């Protein structure tokens, strides 16, 4: 499948402080954040004009699910648009607090762990054909996903009883199963719950919940681009060496703690391989595969960065990727800070900096400041992101959903939508079922809109 439907769901950490002290509980902050949403959507679970879904998830975490996208830059743009949507809610909520005489600063973090050790996720969705053998896909994909943090981890300072250590991934410590149908209780790497949000006879949705939330656009593109390409190669029957892991859960933690990528992890049958070995195998297959594949500039960019990052890890010289990979950008920032102020990695100020890197408020968040200085690479533009806040992807089913929502809101009509249904809540209860996520034009939807 060379054209694939993809989406990213991001849960955001939330807190409210007043002069540095916590002011409101996460529940209370979430209520202020979503008050404007509830006022027009009558719910804290809504679909937006850009085709995305915005809702309050378990544990008072605002969650943004992008609309269906069918190319990488489109997906990165709509992922960033989610930050803008949440930032707007944050600014509105702070104003409400001020108006009510409460005061306080609200923070939304695009990260995966809080100070209490709780974890929240960044889930990737990839449409795959139903006819494929799912067990083979998960078998080949699992070693790739366990070691992928080497190229696209967000980085984290982990405080251990002995000392603080810098890790590749925020999510690795919180994953407890390889493949499972649960998402919260056991936190698997691949979630098998079969909800295709499409024609179930043709498709299923691969739900990957092991990835970190990325701030850097180039890293997000690398994360989803490599996974999508590996899926495409599996579907095309490309053979891969067997890297079945003896214990994926132990392996994912071992990989996260090894910035050299060289520490051997145990494979099934007693063999060993390093994260670098495993990633090199997938990368070399990708380079080979691209020689016979239809040319695609975005995929070529992904494979180029993949190779440069693996070279950087191998040589431990990150100069050629230090604006493109989140964990590399963050580690360089910490090292400069430590050198300048002569402090240990365990210093609380480094932990504060770690958190501030993920603050989505422009002008305040550390990553935003780095990006403005040209220290973090861009894939999109501010204008494209602003457009994606209100405009759905024009090449997928999201266009139909977005146009329907816009028309219904402008006509003052009551409506209900989900990923596949568009419904006018009138006497006739007219509903259109959109089972094909690739389809951006539908006469039935046009007629439904015209009837308003």
Curated annotation (Swiss-Prot):
<dbReference type="GO" id="GO:0070490">
    <property type="term" value="P:protein pupylation"/>
</dbReference>
<feature type="binding site">
    <location>
        <position position="63"/>
    </location>
    <ligand>
        <name>Mg(2+)</name>
    </ligand>
</feature>
<feature type="binding site">
    <location>
        <position position="55"/>
    </location>
    <ligand>
        <name>Mg(2+)</name>
    </ligand>
</feature>
<keyword id="KW-0460">Magnesium</keyword>
<comment type="similarity">
    <text>Belongs to the Pup ligase/Pup deamidase family. Pup-conjugating enzyme subfamily.</text>
</comment>
<keyword id="KW-0436">Ligase</keyword>
<dbReference type="InterPro" id="IPR004347">
    <property type="entry name" value="Pup_ligase/deamidase"/>
</dbReference>
<dbReference type="GO" id="GO:0019787">
    <property type="term" value="F:ubiquitin-like protein transferase activity"/>
</dbReference>
<dbReference type="GO" id="GO:0016879">
    <property type="term" value="F:ligase activity, forming carbon-nitrogen bonds"/>
</dbReference>
<feature type="active site" description="Proton acceptor">
    <location>
        <position position="57"/>
    </location>
</feature>
<keyword id="KW-0067">ATP-binding</keyword>
<feature type="binding site">
    <location>
        <position position="419"/>
    </location>
    <ligand>
        <name>ATP</name>
    </ligand>
</feature>
<comment type="pathway">
    <text>Protein degradation; proteasomal Pup-dependent pathway.</text>
</comment>
<dbReference type="GO" id="GO:0010498">
    <property type="term" value="P:proteasomal protein catabolic process"/>
</dbReference>
<dbReference type="GO" id="GO:0000287">
    <property type="term" value="F:magnesium ion binding"/>
</dbReference>
<feature type="binding site">
    <location>
        <position position="53"/>
    </location>
    <ligand>
        <name>ATP</name>
    </ligand>
</feature>
<dbReference type="InterPro" id="IPR022279">
    <property type="entry name" value="Pup_ligase"/>
</dbReference>
<keyword id="KW-0547">Nucleotide-binding</keyword>
<comment type="pathway">
    <text>Protein modification; protein pupylation.</text>
</comment>
<dbReference type="Pfam" id="PF03136">
    <property type="entry name" value="Pup_ligase"/>
</dbReference>
<keyword id="KW-0832">Ubl conjugation</keyword>
<feature type="binding site">
    <location>
        <position position="66"/>
    </location>
    <ligand>
        <name>ATP</name>
    </ligand>
</feature>
<dbReference type="GO" id="GO:0005524">
    <property type="term" value="F:ATP binding"/>
</dbReference>
<dbReference type="GO" id="GO:0019941">
    <property type="term" value="P:modification-dependent protein catabolic process"/>
</dbReference>
<protein>
    <recommendedName>
        <fullName>Pup--protein ligase</fullName>
        <ecNumber>6.3.1.19</ecNumber>
    </recommendedName>
</protein>
<keyword id="KW-0833">Ubl conjugation pathway</keyword>
<comment type="function">
    <text>Catalyzes the covalent attachment of the prokaryotic ubiquitin-like protein modifier Pup to the proteasomal substrate proteins, thereby targeting them for proteasomal degradation. This tagging system is termed pupylation. The ligation reaction likely involves the side-chain carboxylate of the C-terminal glutamate of Pup and the side-chain amino group of a substrate lysine.</text>
</comment>
<keyword id="KW-0479">Metal-binding</keyword>
<feature type="binding site">
    <location>
        <position position="9"/>
    </location>
    <ligand>
        <name>Mg(2+)</name>
    </ligand>
</feature>
């Amino acid at each position: 499948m060379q054209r694939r439907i993809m989406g990213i769901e991001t849960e955001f950490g939330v807190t409210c402080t007043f002069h540095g002290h916590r002011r409101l509980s996460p529940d209370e902050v979430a209520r202020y954040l979503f008050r404007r949403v509830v006022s027009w959507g009558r719910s804290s679970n809504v679909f937006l004009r850009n085709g995305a879904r915005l809702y309050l998830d378990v544990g008072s975490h605002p969650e943004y699910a992008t609309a269906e996208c069918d190319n990488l830059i489109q997906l990165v743009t709509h992922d960033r648009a989610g930050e803008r949507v949440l930032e707007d809610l944050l600014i509105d909520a702070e104003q409400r607090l001020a108006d009510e005489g409460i005061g306080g600063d609200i923070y939304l973090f695009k990260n995966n762990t809080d100070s209490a050790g709780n974890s929240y996720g960044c889930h990737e969705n990839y449409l795959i054909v139903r006819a494929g053998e799912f067990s083979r896909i998960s078998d080949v994909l699992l070693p790739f996903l366990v070691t992928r943090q080497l190229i696209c981890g967000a980085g984290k300072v982990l405080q251990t009883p002995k000392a603080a250590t810098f890790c590749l991934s925020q999510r690795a410590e919180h994953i407890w199963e390889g493949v499972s149908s649960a998402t919260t209780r056991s936190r698997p790497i691949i979630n098998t719950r079969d909800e295709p949000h499409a024609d179930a006879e043709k498709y299923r949705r691969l739900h990957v919940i092991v990835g970190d939330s990325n701030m850097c656009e180039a890293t997000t593109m690398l994360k989803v681009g490599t996974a999508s390409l590996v899926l495409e190669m599996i579907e095309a029957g490309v053979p891969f060496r067997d890297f079945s892991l003896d214990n994926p859960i132990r392996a994912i933690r071992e990989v996260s703690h090894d910035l050299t990528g060289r520490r051997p992890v145990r494979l099934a049958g007693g063999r060993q391989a390093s994260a670098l070995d495993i990633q090199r195998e997938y990368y070399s297959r990708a380079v080979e595969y691209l020689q016979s594949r239809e040319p695609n500039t975005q995929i070529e960019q992904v494979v180029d960065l993949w190779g440069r990052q693996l070279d950087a890890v191998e040589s431990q010289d990150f100069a050629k990727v230090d604006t493109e990979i989140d964990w590399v950008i963050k580690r360089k920032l910490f090292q400069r800070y430590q050198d300048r102020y002569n402090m240990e990695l365990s210093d609380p100020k480094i932990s504060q900096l770690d958190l501030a890197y993920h603050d989505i408020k422009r002008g305040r968040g550390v990553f935003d400041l780095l990006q403005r200085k040209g220290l973090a690479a861009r894939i999109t533009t501010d204008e494209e992101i602003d457009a994606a806040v209100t405009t759905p992807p024009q090449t997928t089913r999201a266009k139909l959903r977005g146009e329907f929502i816009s028309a219904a809101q402008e006509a003052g009509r009551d409506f209900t939508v989900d990923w596949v249904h568009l419904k006018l809540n009138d006497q006739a209860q007219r509903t259109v079922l959109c089972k094909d996520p690739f389809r951006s034009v539908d006469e039935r939807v046009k007629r439904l809109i015209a009837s308003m």
